[in-house]
Amino acid sequence: LRLYHQQIPFTDVHWGIGSWVLCSVAGFLCHAPQSSLSDYYRQIHLFFLKGKEGSELDSYQKQVEILKALPKHGAFWDRLFYSNYAKYCHSQEKRTPAFQKFFMKWNASSKDDELRRRFLAGSRPLMKYTNLLTFNLRAIVCYIACLTNEVWVYPLFEIIIMSAMYVHMHHEHEQLCERLYK
């Protein structure tokens, strides 16, 4: 709302409805997928580092099984949660085809410890991106943008800078998984 009545930098045009479009693109098309994939990569890394007990790595298939086991009546909130969470997990899995192939190979190989160590060595440098693409950096940039009354900076930062980090992180992680799959 704050951006709505402000002028677009270096022009005499007000943001108006453009502010809603800009913020919607930043939030729905950039922030949401970036955060979900960053979370997924972090959970994958923790899974390979600490095992199932040290990670919250969930699968679409497991969430659907839980959903199907719930009673049809009297479990509205549970069904709503697991339905949405299953979709969330499915979106993560669909965006990581190389990891899915690698993970199936690793599971089928009696959980090869050398392969696990190689994965962790390749995944560790990408963890800085998972941390940057979650809350802290966003909060700092949003805070600075609001304090300086240059709120347009935040959605553009989200769309340009954070998306570039996301693309790099995603590409590198998938390449790592493809190398290890061979």
PLM region spans:
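Multi-pass membrane catalytic core of lipid/isoprenoid biosynthesis enzymes
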Residues: 1-34
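C-terminal membrane-associated helical module and adjoining short loops/tails
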Residues: 30-182
